[in-house]
Amino acid sequence: MSHDSDDKTFPYQKDDAELRRRLTPMQYEVTQHAATERAFTGEYTDTEDAGIYKCVVCSTPLFESGAKFHSGCGWPSYFKPLNGEVIDEKVDYSHGMVRVEVRCNNCGAHLGHVFEDGPRDKTGLRYCINSAALNFESRPENE
């Protein structure tokens, strides 16, 4: 699934040639063509350090480490984004399923999907995000 047919215009317009130079092939395929990295292979799947997860394309802060949890699905999982403005959600009918795709609301980069099987004592949501779509910025817990 590519975002080429999507009508939404995002604030950050990215140059494809520059992205191909700057991103790894996996980062490019995940963020620009909605590919999915293999389960349990992502750099941030088991990261427990305090910090902020940012969009690999435009550096928009997306998730805090305090919202991360171990879901056992093989991808980094969060029960909420940093705030309600950073994520764009779109119904995804690919692969014979109906899911909700999660994209960066600044640049449109594909991040992953959101499911309603997250921690019930939090939001009940599980944002299942590809590590390849993220950069992690370590921060002390109290910041």
From Swiss-Prot:
GO terms for molecular function: peptide-methionine (R)-S-oxide reductase activity; zinc ion binding. Gene3D superfamilies: Peptide methionine sulfoxide reductase. It catalyses: L-methionyl-[protein] + [thioredoxin]-disulfide + H2O = L-methionyl-(R)-S-oxide-[protein] + [thioredoxin]-dithiol. Binds 1 zinc ion per subunit. The zinc ion is important for the structural integrity of the protein. InterPro entries: Met_Sox_Rdtase_MsrB, Met_Sox_Rdtase_MsrB_dom, Mss4-like_sf. It comes from the Bacteria. The keyword Zinc applies. This is Peptide methionine sulfoxide reductase MsrB. It comes from Burkholderia cenocepacia (strain HI2424). The gene is msrB.
